């Protein structure tokens, strides 16, 4: 597998060059064999999709609680339409008491808005506004369950973060922080702090979103050659500012400077590690103003000591504040700042205005463009489509994990097979949830009915929909949903259709989403927990062999399905598991002689 697979949340193993094989020579599989196992218990929490509006009934103003310092311009906007309570530095207990009297809450990163906050509001809290981008401190599942819309302010601090990244890069290259400390200590060591020039150097921007784009613009102005890696960045946007989009491996191998601007997700956690540092040009310099967790900090210390990384400039850390005795922070070739990316007066005012406008709009029942959890659809439609909504998201999530890291998804086709006429089947929510499933595993964007099409367009993802009208009763809204991703490289060759597209199909059985087809192979496995897909030679004992390996590792199997072309030919085994197998366990499965390839998928 290529190194770009490090950016993927799944683990894939394939033998030889199976990854590029299509299944065009195989005939469609007519049947599937299924074996069911008892589950240890699954999370059955039902989520409501909401779009809020706030009305006090008696014409009085709503109450907005501002729990952390907000710019004056934002406070004034709030005071024009609401009663504003600015209470800073509250304890969790104080917040829980006060929240029952409030319709909206505005926080920054220092206030944890957990389930207990929503429970304490007794249903009155309608909007939570996060003054900034990250929403790690807000329990989105609880917010949605309690009918509370969460909005953020993702654009106002873009320039500030980009400027700080450039400032750190220049300060690092010229040893500004170290030289400053030396002079203040009474020294005058000019030769010790000779730096390097930026002009003519290659900067790799990892994550070409809003901040990454602005960093690239400024680096170009400094005379740097800029390349970028982001599987979902539109090539035309990059080319418009003179930036070449390259693979993850190429970015690592050719860069003199690397600037990180990716979100922290399960797929990007510790994406810079011992393995990826080893692929970098010796003497590379690294800047991080994104999220601390995208770098394995211990591995970075080792890379610095080994001379692979010449210098690093960091504004963010895995744990903030970092430990006083942190080897990374104390390293003589590391420049650090205390998470100042958005800390300019202009950015603070901009964030205040942006979040105030979003909260006021949401309280007025408007569709919030910066909403990060789902809006409401009619109760009737939601009740009927609820299991299909879950199916849609999981099919999208499964399909994107079958794509080899770095190839990027640009085209997705959704096929709905139904006995209902087009006018009787509203697929907007299903389309949004498939978009959510495709984008969220590799992004920090929270996709919902409000922002799905906008987010897809922004990331260069084109979605087309097709209806297949079936004969029969239209009592059930859908028979199957099929998701196909074209022009991509697959990490699991068997997921390719006869036309070379990653293809997955599913349906709802007794209210539970099922995976029913992978590529041209028919299977039948519930879309819960995690799934292992194996392509194997169909022979006796395979179910027992794989099951024994999982059992020895205390991995509980809840469902197993085998689909085959014909007896003793190729087959696909789909195994549903309640637990995440270790790498060693997965390796043992891959070493079974009859297993030709396999992939582990987290749903």
UniProtKB/Swiss-Prot annotation:
| Tissue expression from the record | Ubiquitous, but highly expressed in roots. Expressed in vasculature, root and shoot meristems, distal part of cotyledons and leaves, anther, stigma and pollen grains. Detected at the tip of the cotyledons in late embryos.
Predominant localisation class: plastid
The record's disulfide annotation reads none
Binding positions (NAD(+)): 210-211, 230, 289-291, 315, 339-342
* Family matches, as SMART domains: AdoHcyase_NAD (SM00997)
EC number assigned by the record: 1.1.1.95
Q: Which domain of life is it from?
A: Eukaryota
Family under the similarity heading: Belongs to the D-isomer specific 2-hydroxyacid dehydrogenase family.
Domain ACT per the UniProt entry, residue ranges: 531-603
Phenotype of gene-disrupted mutants: Embryo lethal when homozygous.
| Active site residues of this protein | 291, 320, 339
Q: Could you tell me one molecular function GO term of this UniProt entry?
A: phosphoglycerate dehydrogenase activity
The regulatory note on its activity is: Partially inhibited by 5 mM serine.
Record protein name field: D-3-phosphoglycerate dehydrogenase 1, chloroplastic
Pathway(s) it belongs to: Amino-acid biosynthesis; L-serine biosynthesis; L-serine from 3-phospho-D-glycerate: step 1/3
Its function, per the record, reads: Involved in the plastidial phosphorylated pathway of serine biosynthesis (PPSB). Required for mature pollen development.
What cellular component terms from Gene Ontology apply here? chloroplast; chloroplast stroma; mitochondrion; plasma membrane; plastid
Enzyme's top EC category: oxidoreductase
Among Gene3D superfamilies, the record links this protein to: 3.30.70.260, D-3-phosphoglycerate dehydrogenase, domain 3, NAD(P)-binding Rossmann-like Domain
The reply to whether Transcription figures as a keyword in the UniProt entry is no
| Family annotation (Pfam families) | 2-Hacid_dh, 2-Hacid_dh_C, ACT, PGDH_inter
Q: Which InterPro entries does UniProt cross-reference here?
A: ACT-like_dom_sf, ACT_dom, Ado_hCys_hydrolase_NAD-bd, ASB_dom_sf, D-isomer_2_OHA_DH_cat_dom, D-isomer_DH_CS, D-isomer_DH_CS1, D-isomer_DH_NAD-bd
User: What are the inducing conditions?
Assistant: Up-regulated in the aerial parts by dark treatment, high CO(2) levels and necrotrophic pathogen infection.
Gene this protein is translated from: PGDH1
């Amino acid at each position: 597998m290529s190194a770009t697979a490090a950016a993927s949340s799944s683990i894939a193993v394939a033998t030889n060059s199976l990854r590029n094989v299509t299944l065009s020579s195989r005939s469609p599989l007519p049947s599937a064999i299924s074996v069911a196992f008892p589950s240890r218990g699954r999370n059955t929490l039902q989520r409501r999709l909401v779009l809020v509006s706030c009305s006090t009934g008696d014409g009085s103003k709503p109450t907005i609680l501002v729990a952390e310092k907000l710019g004056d311009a934002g406070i004034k906007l709030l005071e024009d339409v609401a009663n504003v309570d600015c209470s800073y530095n509250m304890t969790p207990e104080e917040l829980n008491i006060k929240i029952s009297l409030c319709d909206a809450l505005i926080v920054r990163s220092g206030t944890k808005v957990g389930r207990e906050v929503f429970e304490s509001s007794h249903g009155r809290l309608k909007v939570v506004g996060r003054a900034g981008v990250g929403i790690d401190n807000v329990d989105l599942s609880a917010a949605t369950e309690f009918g509370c819309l969460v909005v953020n302010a993702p654009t106002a601090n873009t320039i500030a973060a980009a400027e700080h990244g450039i400032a750190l890069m220049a300060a690092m290259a010229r040893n500004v922080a170290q030289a400053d400390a030396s002079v203040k200590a009474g020294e005058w060591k000019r030769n010790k702090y000779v730096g390097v020039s930026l002009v003519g150097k290659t900067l790799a921007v990892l994550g070409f979103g809003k901040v990454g784009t602005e960093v690239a613009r400024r680096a170009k102005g400094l005379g740097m050659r800029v390349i970028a890696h982001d599987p979902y960045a539109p090539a035309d946007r990059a080319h418009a500012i003179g930036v070449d989009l390259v693979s993850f491996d190429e970015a690592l191998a050719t860069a003199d400077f690397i600037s990180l601007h990716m979100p922290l997700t399960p797929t990007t956690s510790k994406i810079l590690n011992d393995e990826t540092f080893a692929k970098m040009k010796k003497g590379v310099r690294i800047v991080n103003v994104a999220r601390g967790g995208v770098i394995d900090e211990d591995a970075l210390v080792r890379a610095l000591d080994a001379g692979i990384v010449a210098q690093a400039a960091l504004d963010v850390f895995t744990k903030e504040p970092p430990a006083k005795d942190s080897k990374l922070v104390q390293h003589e070739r590391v420049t650090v700042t205390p998470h100042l990316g958005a800390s300019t007066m202009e950015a603070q005012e901009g964030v205040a205005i942006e979040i105030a406008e979003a909260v006021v709009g949401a309280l007025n029942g408007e569709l919030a463009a910066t909403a990060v959890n789902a809006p409401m659809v009619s109760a009737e439609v939601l009740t009927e489509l609820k299991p299909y909504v879950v199916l849609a998201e999981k099919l999208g999530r499964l399909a994107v994990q079958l794509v080899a890291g770095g190839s990027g998804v640009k085209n997705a086709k959704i096929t709905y097979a139904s006995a209902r006429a087009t006018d009787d089947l509203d697929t907007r929510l299903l389309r949004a949830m498939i978009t959510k499933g495709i984008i969220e595993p590799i992004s920090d964007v929270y996709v919902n009915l409000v922002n799905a099409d906008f987010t897809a367009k922004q990331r260069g993802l084109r979605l087309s929909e097709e209806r297949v009208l079936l004969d029969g009763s239209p009592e059930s809204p859908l028979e199957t949903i099929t998701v196909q991703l074209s022009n991509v490289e697959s990490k699991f060759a068997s997921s390719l259709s006869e036309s070379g597209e990653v293809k997955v199909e599913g349906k709802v059985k007794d209210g539970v989403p099922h995976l029913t087809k992978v590529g041209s192979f028919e299977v039948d496995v519930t879309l819960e927990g995690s799934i292992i897909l194996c392509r194997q030679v169909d022979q006796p004992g395979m179910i027992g062999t794989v099951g024994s390996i999982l059992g020895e590792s205390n991995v509980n199997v809840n469902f197993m399905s085998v689909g085959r072309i014909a007896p003793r030919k190729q087959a696909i085994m789909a195994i549903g598991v309640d637990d995440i197998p270790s790498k060693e366990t997965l390796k043992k499965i891959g070493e079974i002689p009859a297993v030709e390839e396999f992939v582990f998928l987290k749903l």
